[in-house]
């Protein structure tokens, strides 16, 4: 039995992780975020009520769950306050159930200013960041000039460090990007309020999680974004700024890697991507590519980013990219989401290989973005189904064509599909194998 479960995306993000984390946390004591920041967008629908979380772990809607933000997360206190307010107005005791590592790097206004100024300067070569300061905050961390949550509790020393780092960033903003400088006095004043807010929630996360493990408590690690956006293993440079893969769990939480159990990979029954970057099976982007099937996927699947509101690009399921994600993460089993979006399509395609210019075939996707320019997807066509799968709760409720589609994905990837999501509500799910019971 796996007491410690990792839930992560195996595509380009937006796979539906939030719903699955919420579903599985019925059996968990802890839910831990270990990377990313408020650039994540996890949408949960419970009894018809929609909640979108960006920073707070998805387990916050479960009364019995402690939610943890690990050291690998870059924390925007401003974003945290905005997210806490509507939850607390609904009677959810966020401050009593949310715990934060003192080692979390802080996202402050100058990070946001830098992020946005850079995207403007890139013009047509823009990466498509969320403009929320994530990348610049990680840069400061690696350069060892970043301010962390723990720094807020010595305000005199914080003020000195802040002045130094803001001189560095404001020089770039004004002289290179021709943007306005960020006010040191305003940022410092905001920080004083942040210290008061965070004091009661800051803990030694490593010690807390290790004690939980020794007690036999069930712990879930909630990934943000997706494997193919990983800073090291994704389609670089069109990636996020953190390690979105299973390897990021230990580094981003301080939890011993030997104790990780089941790795649940979340994948849509088709593919989507937000922003720029390679997408071999793309059908629709709202601009140059206007395939009607791709438009169906985007419209029926409500494919708009929960964080940015941007239209997602859509395409066929890519087993080649999935094999790369499986290698990196040691995926134990899949959760296939949005199966119901495929309802009504006469035929479906799965990418089984990438053909190179020299005629050779890749079975696992390349890493660098440039390499994707030389590939042509090889498709296998399967019959679709006209029946309605929305809200199905057992395999018996699915048409045979849908079952065949799922089985083919299992065959092509070598990994079982243990969970199938057939709608946005936590109850619209088929659970073949429960990760905590595997």
From Swiss-Prot:
IMP binds at residues 14-17, 39-42, 130, 144, 225, 240, 310. The active site is at 14 (proton acceptor), 42 (proton donor). Its cofactor is Mg(2+). InterPro entries: Adenylosuccin_syn_GTP-bd, Adenylosuccin_syn_Lys_AS, Adenylosuccinate_synth_dom1, Adenylosuccinate_synth_dom2, Adenylosuccinate_synth_dom3, Adenylosuccinate_synthetase, P-loop_NTPase. Substrate binds at residues 306-312. GTP binds at residues 13-19, 41-43, 312, 338-340, 421-423. It catalyses: IMP + L-aspartate + GTP = N(6)-(1,2-dicarboxyethyl)-AMP + GDP + phosphate + 2 H(+). Keywords: Cytoplasm, GTP-binding, Ligase, Magnesium, Metal-binding, Nucleotide-binding, Purine biosynthesis. It comes from the Bacteria. One of its GO terms (molecular function) is GTP binding. The keyword Cytoplasm applies. Mg(2+) binds at residues 14, 41. Gene3D superfamilies: Adenylosuccinate Synthetase, subunit A, domain 1 (3.40.440.10), Adenylosuccinate Synthetase, subunit A, domain 2 (1.10.300.10), Adenylosuccinate Synthetase, subunit A, domain 3 (3.90.170.10). Belongs to the adenylosuccinate synthetase family. Plays an important role in the de novo pathway of purine nucleotide biosynthesis. Catalyzes the first committed step in the biosynthesis of AMP from IMP. This is Adenylosuccinate synthetase. It comes from Vibrio vulnificus (strain CMCP6).
């Amino acid at each position: 039995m796996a007491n410690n479960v990792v839930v992560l995306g195996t595509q380009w993000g937006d796979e539906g992780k939030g719903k699955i984390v919420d579903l599985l946390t019925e059996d968990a004591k802890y839910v831990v975020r270990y990377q990313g920041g408020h650039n994540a967008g996890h949408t949960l629908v419970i009894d018809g009520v929609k909640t979108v979380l960006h920073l707070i772990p998805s387990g916050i809607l479960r009364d019995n769950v402690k939610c943890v933000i690990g050291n690998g997360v870059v924390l925007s206190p401003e974003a945290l306050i905005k997210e806490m307010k509507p939850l607390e107005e609904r009677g959810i005791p966020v401050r009593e159930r949310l715990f934060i590592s003192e080692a979390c790097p802080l996202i402050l206004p100058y990070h946001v200013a830098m992020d946005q100024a850079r995207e403007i300067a890139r013009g047509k070569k823009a990466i498509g960041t969320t403009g929320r300061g994530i990348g610049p905050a990680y840069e400061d961390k690696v350069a060892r000039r970043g301010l962390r949550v723990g720094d807020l509790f010595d305000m005199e020393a914080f003020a000195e460090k802040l002045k130094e780092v803001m001189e560095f960033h404001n020089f770039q903003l004004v002289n290179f990007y021709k943007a306005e400088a960020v006010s040191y006095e305003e940022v410092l004043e905001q920080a004083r309020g942040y210290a008061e807010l965070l004091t009661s929630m800051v803990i030694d996360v490593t010690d807390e999680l290790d004690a939980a493990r020794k007690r036999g408590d069930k712990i879930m690690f909630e990934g943000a974004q997706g494997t193919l956006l990983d800073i090291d293993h994704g389609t670089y440079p069109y990636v996020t700024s953190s390690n979105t893969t299973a390897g990021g769990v230990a580094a981003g939480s301080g939890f011993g890697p030997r104790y990780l159990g089941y790795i649940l990979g979340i994948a849509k029954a088709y593919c989507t991507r937000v922003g720029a970057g390679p997408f071999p099976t793309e059908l629709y982007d709202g601009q140059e590519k206007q395939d009607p099937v791709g438009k169906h996927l985007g419209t029926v699947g409500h494919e708009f980013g929960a964080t940015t509101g941007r239209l997602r690009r859509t395409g066929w399921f890519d087993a080649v990219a999935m094999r790369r994600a499986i290698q990196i993460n040691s995926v134990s089993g899949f959760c296939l989401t949005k199966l119901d979006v495929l309802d009504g399509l006469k035929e479906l395609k799965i990418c089984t290989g990438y053909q190179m210019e020299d005629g050779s075939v890749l079975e696992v996707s390349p890493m660098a973005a440039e390499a994707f320019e030389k590939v042509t997807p090889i498709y296998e066509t399967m019959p679709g189904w006209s029946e309605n799968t929305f809200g199905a709760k057992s395999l018996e409720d699915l048409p045979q064509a849908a079952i065949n589609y799922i089985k083919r994905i299992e065959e092509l990837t070598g990994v079982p599909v243990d969970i199938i999501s057939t709608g946005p509500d936590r109850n619209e799910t088929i659970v073949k194998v429960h990760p905590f019971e595997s």
